[in-house]
Curated annotation (Swiss-Prot):
Designated name of the protein: Protein dom34
Any single biological process term in GO: nuclear-transcribed mRNA catabolic process, no-go decay
Cofactor: a divalent metal cation
Gene Ontology molecular-function annotations: GTPase regulator activity; metal ion binding; translation release factor activity
Amino acid sequence: MKLIQKNIEKNGSGWITMCPEEPEDMWHLYNILQVGDQLKASTVRRVVKVGATGSTSGSRVVMKLRILVENMDFDTKAAQLHIKGRTTEYHPEVKMGSYHTLDLELHRNFTLYKNEWDAFALDRVDAACNPSRNAEIGAVVLDEGLANICLITDYMTILRQRIDQVIPRKRRGDSSAYQKGLDKFYDSVFQSINSEFDFDKLKVVILASPGFVARGLYDYIFSMAVKLDLKQIVKSKNKFVILHSSTGHIHSLNEILKDPAVESKLADTKYVQEIRVLNKFYDVMNEDDRKAWYGPNHVLKAFELGAIGELLISDSLFRSSDIATRKKWVSLVEGVKEINCPVYIFSSLHESGKQLDLLSGIAAILTYPVDEEDISEDEEDEESQNFEHS
C-alpha cells in the first residue's frame, strides 16, 4: 500500500488517502473499514442522456463518488473488496443519497474518512504501508496428482494455483504410463512455480508431501532449471526445503511450518511467530489449564486481575459492526501493551488464525494460575448485583 496523504485531527477524526498496490492490501482495507465510515473512490457508472428529440443515449463514465459505508464484502479468492453505501457528496450525474457499490481497484487512489481513527486502524495502515512487507514463503503442498501452490505473507495465505491431474496406476512389470503421468504432473507444477514465485524475494520455498512426491518434484525442478538455464531458480537452491506432510491439502501448512528446518529460516516473520505462540498456548493448556484461558469473558477477567502474560487475538474481532465492541478489543490490546506484554494479532486468513477463531478468536497465556471457580464466582457476584439493581 502506498500512503498518499494523511490528515488526522487531535480528536482522532480525519482522512487518509492511499493507493493499493497488491492483492493483500485489499485484506488490510477490509480490516480497517467500518460501517459508518465514508469512502471516496473512482468508479464507473452508466449515464443516460436524453436528446432534444427525446431519444436516449448511454455511456459509461468514470467518476469519483463519496459514500457512507453500509456493507462490505471481501472475496478471498479474487482478493477483491466491494463496499456498498449511499452517496454523501454532490455529483452532477448521481442523485444524492442513492445507493452505489464501490469496487476498489489496484493502483487507484481512494480516501477513507473516519470519525475516529483508533489505534488498531492506524497500526494496520502502518503495516500495510511498510515497504519491507512482501511474501516471504513460497509453498507447494502436494501428493500424487494434487498440488497447491501458495504464497504466504504476514497476513494472507494466497492460493496461486491448484493442480489436480489423474496419474495412471502402476502396473505390475510396466510403470511407464505411471512415470509419464507423474512427469507430466511435475512439469505442470514446475511451470506454475516458475511463473508465480519471485525466487529473489522469497526467503524459503517449501515442498511438502506424504511419501517421496516432494523429493521427486525437487529433482524435477532442478533438472529442468539446469536444462533451461533458469539462473534465478538454480541460485535459489539453498532456499528449498523438502518436508513431510500428512496430506497434499492446503490445511497441512500449519503442521508443515512447525518444522524446525522452516522455523530457523523464518524465525522473525509474523506468521511463524503466530504459529509458535499458538502452539505454546496449547502446550500450557495441556500442562496447567489454569494458566491458559480463552473466550471473551475469561480473557477480559484475566486482564482485570493483571494475569495476562501474552495475548492472542484474531483480527476478525475488530471487524465488529458494533462500535462499542470494537472499542472494547482496541482498549484491551492497548492495555496489555501498556504493561509491556506481547500482543499477537492473528490474521483470520491464515490457518493459525482460523484455529484461534475456533477458540472464539481470543486467548491468553497467564503469568500465574487462575482457577475457573474464581472467575465464575466473580461473574455470579456481578450478575447478583445487576439483579439487585434491577
